[in-house]
Amino acid sequence: MTSEQVRGAIRAFVTQNSEHTWSGRAVARIFHGIASPNFPAKQWGRVRSAWRSHLDVDFNLLVRMATQEVLSLRRGRYSIFL
């Protein structure tokens, strides 16, 4: 999977779940299937399109990419209605 495909998946995920305030680390944790108190596996494991969907991408790289995309969305660089 290319970095642009991963970035597209990040943007789609964040916009589809815009009721949450996302950080790059939170998105990366979902994409790697790592539960947290705010994003428990019991709830987010049902989101098959995202949970554990990018295990092939280095976690720290995914955090950096997700942080960049989340900030871009917040700044209005992308339309919230993709």
Regions found by a protein language model. Give the residues of each.
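Accessory DNA-binding and partner-docking regions appended to nucleic-acid-acting proteins
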Residues: 1-82
